[in-house]
Amino acid sequence: MATNIGMMDSAYFVGRSEILAWINSTLQLNLSKVEEACSGAVHCQLMDSVHPGTVPMHKVNFDAKSEYEMIQNYKVLQDVFNKLKITKHIEVSKLVKGRPLDNLEFMQWMKKYCDSVNGGQHNYHALERREASKGGKEATKRAAATQQSGKSSSSSAPPRPSSSNGTRKHEPQSNNTGTHHSSTGNHHHSSKPSAKQSKPVPAYDEKITELKLYIDSLEKERDFYFSKLRDVEILCQNPDTEHLPLVGSIKRILYAADGEDVGAAETQTLSPIAEGSEERRNSVTESQKRKLIVNLDVDVAAITTLSPRQRLSDASDVKCSGSSPLLTC
């Protein structure tokens, strides 16, 4: 059962049109955009389709408009996940915003999970189950009305303009054949651009959706790097480290104006500091060596300046210290 799906799984490469076709066929809806399912009601019914009786459909609100109402639907979904021991994290704060990319990713996961449970087989009475929900009947009516309007618009489409044979048929009825032919030809040519202009609309919608998804991905990447920079800024504001030269250089780079190249300048500024610290370490080592040599010279000089009596006294002290405690010097 696919509860944990990686971002590189094939589930996240399922297209938007395939997701919409799956939702509409399973739940007998007529969604045109994936983000229309951001209220969470569709997710709850999809779980009900693969786990009948697990979802309390009377708590699901298909007429949810505000974020508060949507969050209640996601609470129902989270309870179902907990009951089924599904560990998938639901990013409610992002889904209720209706952003296309977030809703598409979560719906891709839903499809992968549902297919892993029922193998893609659908034997579900969506209309009957949805009637128990708040706004379920209205959602069914809206879907039916949308489907009916689509059928009527396709059936009532005007016929295409007649061919040039029809134009020739009316030519004998006019005295000024040249004028009538030119006006008919102009009308025929003017109708072509309008027909061409009405065709690319779905293509533009598809392109707009792709651009929205791309913008969402860029925003997520921007937020990721901004959080990293914010962590660096918090670290630089630590009282224990903010006085360090390196931290000061990092701050100047963070707060530099747009177009201001401070990276190279800060690198040159830090180089003498590093060299100076190395020189200080070397000088300390040399001074310690010199001090040790001076101390040795002083000790040798002190020994050489002793008188013969002091040397004999020192020698007798040594002998006494090495003899028995009962002996006296």
UniProtKB/Swiss-Prot annotation:
Domain EB1 C-terminal, first and last residues per copy: 193-263
Positions of the UniProt region annotated as Disordered? 130-203
Provide the Gene Ontology terms for cellular component: microtubule; nucleolus; nucleus; phragmoplast; spindle
Q: In which tissues is it expressed?
A: Highly expressed in the root and shoot meristems, in guard cells of leaf stomata, pollen grains and pollen tubes.
Cite the InterPro entries for this sequence.
CH_dom, CH_dom_sf, EB1_C, EB1_C_sf, MAPRE
Describe the subunit structure: Homodimer.
Q: Know the name of this protein?
A: Microtubule-associated protein RP/EB family member 1C
Q: Which organism is it from?
A: Arabidopsis thaliana
